[in-house]
Amino acid sequence: MQFKLAFVSIALATLAVATPAPRGEPASSCSTGDLQCCNTVEPASSPSASTILGLLGIVIQGVDVLVGLTCSPITVIGLESGGCSAQAVCCTDNSNGGLISIGCLPVTL
């Protein structure tokens, strides 16, 4: 019994160490929406994001959803020239006039 517990503990520790850290997706994998260049990307629960969401009357399920603040679309021309000096993201909801984009994932250009 103790051998099983030790084996399981070692296996879980090895798995935790061997699991790679999440990184930004490549820009070519943006299948949920348009590429955006956002000044900041933060959790929806952050003070600035929650204030903007509240003012717009937007309710988000889950506080760990990433939102982009002050975003603009990245065009093909902008992509070729590295046209985003802030945070490039792929967001599921860009319908708020660039003020806030919802459901964002960081991408690498």
Curated annotation (Swiss-Prot):
Aerial growth, conidiation, and dispersal of filamentous fungi in the environment rely upon a capability of their secreting small amphipathic proteins called hydrophobins (HPBs) with low sequence identity. Class I can self-assemble into an outermost layer of rodlet bundles on aerial cell surfaces, conferring cellular hydrophobicity that supports fungal growth, development and dispersal; whereas Class II form highly ordered films at water-air interfaces through intermolecular interactions but contribute nothing to the rodlet structure. Its main location: secreted. Self-assembles to form functional amyloid fibrils called rodlets. Self-assembly into fibrillar rodlets occurs spontaneously at hydrophobic:hydrophilic interfaces and the rodlets further associate laterally to form amphipathic monolayers. It comes from the Eukaryota. The gene is hyd2. One of its GO terms (cellular component) is fungal-type cell wall. It is found in: Secreted; Secreted, Cell wall. This is Class I hydrophobin 2. Pfam families: Hydrophobin. Residues 1-18 form the signal peptide. It comes from Lentinula edodes. Keywords: Cell wall, Disulfide bond, Secreted, Signal. The lineage of its organism: Eukaryota, Fungi, Dikarya, Basidiomycota, Agaricomycotina. One of its GO terms (molecular function) is structural constituent of cell wall. Belongs to the fungal hydrophobin family. InterPro entries: Hydrophobin. Disulfide bonds join 30-90, 37-84, 38-71, 91-104. SMART domains: HYDRO (SM00075).
